[in-house]
Structure formats: C-alpha cells, structure tokens
Amino acid sequence: DVKDIYMIRSKLEGLCAFLATTQITDEQMEELEENIYLSKFHAKKGHSEQNAELDNRFHETLYDACHSKMLKHQLQDFHDYVLRVRKKTLSQTQRSAESIKEHEMIFEAIKNKQPQEAEKLANQHIINAYKNMVRSGLYEAYGQEPPKEEDFLYNTENGGDSYGQD
C-alpha cells in the first residue's frame, strides 16, 4: 500500500537525516550543497528531468551519509518503488520548488548539527511529497483508491505521530 510506504519512508528518512547529522563527511556536505545549487538553477530553467535526477541524488547522498547499510537498503527499495510517481510530481513547478526548499532546510539542519530538526524536516518532506501525490491524482497510478484528506494528513497536533491517527 502506497500510504504505508510513505508513512514508513517518512520515519526512515527522518532517522537517516538524524544519523547523518553526526556522521556526514565534508565531501558529502559539499555534494548536498552543490546539489541544492544545481537544483535551483535547473528549476529556474524549467528542467524537470534534471531536477528529478538531482532529487534522487540528494536522497542517495543522504542515505550514504547516515552510514547504515541496512537503513540505506530499505530507503532505496522504497525510493525505487515510488520513483515513477515521484518523477511526475517533481515535474510540477510548485512541488519542485517546495522540494528544493525542503532539501535546503534539511541540509541546514545537518550543517548546524541539529539532529532532531533534521529528522523532523526530512520526515515532513516525505509527508509533503505524499500529500502532493494524492492531490495530483497520482495515487491511482498504483491501482488504488485515493485516500480522503483526513486519511493522509500527518497529525502533529497534541503530540500525534501518525498519518490520520493519534
């Protein structure tokens, strides 16, 4: 189920960003910084294919930076499963710009050695991608009925920590 994949992926991406905060190398930091710079450039030019590739590379660099082979393997599997739809959502100018901004915020949290903030931002980044996929009508690409708005909202109010659940 796509919803489950995004829910699990959001948590694992958060964990990955958390771990990367203390384990990332200088070279990986430079890769992320360059990635964001290039993403902004290609977004201004309307190059959606390049931005989709840069988005993939951003996540791959983050997976490497956490230095956990098992976590990287799990995230790559989830990432690959939703790749087709991700390319379509990233071709949307608004989502592409939002995604780049979210990457930049994750990068800044890692750079500033703020593991909890990096975790929260990475988690929210995946949730935002999921919400955009549903709003764009791409959920059906997996042969599934789209959830109702209340089914996919990430409830962080009052300490809630799940998709549509408290």
Which residue stretches match the model-derived regions?
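Bacterial carbohydrate/catabolite-sensing allosteric modules
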Residues: 26, 46, 94, 113-116, ...
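Conserved amphipathic alpha-helical segments that form helical-bundle/coiled-coil interaction surfaces
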Residues: 8-11, 15-18, 22-88, 101-109, ...
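A short, acidic/glycine-rich surface segment
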Residues: 90-92
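Anionic, Ser/Thr-rich low-complexity intrinsically disordered regions
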Residues: 96-100, 118, 128-129, 133, ...
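Short linear motifs at protein or domain termini
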Residues: 1-22, 64, 130, 134-166
